[in-house]
Amino acid sequence: MQYLQFLSLVVLLLMCHARKSVYRRNSPSLRRLTRNYDWEVDEHGGLKPIINPAKVERATKNCANDSFILGTIMSNYNRHKIPGGQVDVEVEVWVQEITTISDITSDFQLDIYIYETWYDPALNYAFMNPCKYNLSLNSVLLEKLWTPNSCFINSKTADIHKSPFPNIFLMIYANGTVWTNYRLKLQGPCIMDLTKFPFDNVTCSLTFESFNYNTDEVKMDWSVNGVQKMRDKMELADYELVDIHKIRTTEEYPAGYWHELTMSFEFKRRAGWYILQAYLPTYLTICISWISFALGSKAIPARTMLGVNSLLAMTFQFGNIIRNLPRVSYVKAIDVWMLSCMTFVFCSLLELAWVGYLSREEEPTSAKCLQPSAQVAPKPCHPPPVQQNANNSSVHRRQKQPKNEEESALLSLRDNDYGYIPPGFGLNGNVANAMKSFSSSCSCEPTNVVNLMLDEAETIPTSTSSSLSRKQRREILAHKIDSVSVFMFPFLFVLFNIAYWQHYLRGY
């Protein structure tokens, strides 16, 4: 019997020790919650809680409600006093949406949730036996509490969403921890280097810091989560979000050192629109300009129309693209492409001008011959005898000395060794009179004299055959230029494409 009593005492001692161990392992808040429960030994020898309705009802009646807690802690609260002399603030950002990125103004817009957490011992209400161990409050009470007065120092605009009320969340835990949440619409700057546009990357950043307190009073740092996206994949029409970086730096100001929390967004431009609207049309325009090489040297008007229209179309395309870009002073990748393609079209026009110059028809110099009259019968003409000079083997005609200027002109016409008759010869009526006066020495009519001189001119060889061969050579040269251009222009354009795409797609 005594042995059984001894065993019962040992079991009771073990149960008491186990219950104390459970209380010791749990936090004070958990021990307060267990006041509403009874305990029993389970099949493994441990303790499990059993709800006691009487204890719950008694604890509910005696707990402090929200109004009592707020009235108590705010009665002696000083919002200008820094909690504990120095505060550690943890910041966490959740990106809800990135709406736009502007190339003209070099900025971006986004919606975020930003959380701030710090400890304020003056707001501790755990000792009041609260009914709730966290109080969810609105922005009205936040204006009465101490805050780190943090802001985005490099934002262009920052607005709190107010639909249907200010989107500010405040929670105060029983141990004095303050948790705030703001839903903001921000517009921040972007660093744009358009040298490789449209195959470039854009970096946008926002910097968050306490505006009033330096590191001696407020220390700011990222939380474990840092910056997170609310959606796995965020894409815009022109950009794709590549990565988000969080950075913590210490910056020196005249008033001391400040902690700055920077979140950097890296975007990659989507080049599909520019390929469809700029690159592919220019390929077609360049190919159209090459069609003129196959039309031949006789289709100068058609070739001119093709070249000019190609150049105008490319200029119009270039203007539509650059009007949506900032006016930068350096050369962009799209500038290199468009200007190079315009140069190819312009060179095809220069080739056309060269071919047109070579293939143009030169008008032969026509001589107006004096025709004999049909009513007057020609009389035989006996020209003066011709004497050969052995010294120079030239022909000298014996002739009467001219009496006046008209006869001198007529003699010059007769002695013309090249068979050339001036275009205006015979228009003056005095020449006919000179022929009549000159006919007495030749015993023939004036018309017969002219015919005689024309017959003599036909016996002299001309350059007709040489002029014809020169025209043929020019046409052959024009054809060769077109034949070479058909292969040279595409070959040079392919070389340009290889160099262009290899350079600008590197690192994209």
Swiss-Prot record:
Intrachain disulfide bonds: 190-204
Topology class, membrane: Multi-pass membrane protein
Signal sequence, start to end: 1-18
Name of the protein in question: Probable ligand-gated ion channel 46
Membership in a protein family: Belongs to the ligand-gated ion channel (TC 1.A.9) family.
PROSITE patterns: NEUROTR_ION_CHANNEL
CDD domains linked: LGIC_ECD_GABAAR (cd18990), LGIC_TM_anion (cd19049)
Gene that encodes the chain: lgc-46
Taxonomic classification: Eukaryota, Metazoa, Ecdysozoa, Nematoda, Chromadorea
Organism (species): Caenorhabditis elegans
Phenotype of the disrupted gene, per the record: Viable, with normal growth, reproduction and locomotion. Increased sensitivity to the acetylcholine esterase inhibitor aldicarb, but normal sensitivity to levamisole, an agonist for postsynaptic acetylcholine receptors on muscles. In response to induced acetylcholine release, the amplitude and rise phase of excitatory postsynaptic currents (eEPSCs) during synaptic transmission is as wild-type, but there is prolonged and slow decay of eEPSCs during the late phase of synaptic transmission, which results in increased release of synaptic vesicles in cholinergic motor neurons.
Free-text tissue specificity from the UniProt record: Expressed in the nervous system, with high expression in cholinergic motor neurons and weak expression in GABAergic motor neurons.
Region described as Disordered: 374-407
Residues modified by glycosylation: 65, 134, 175, 201
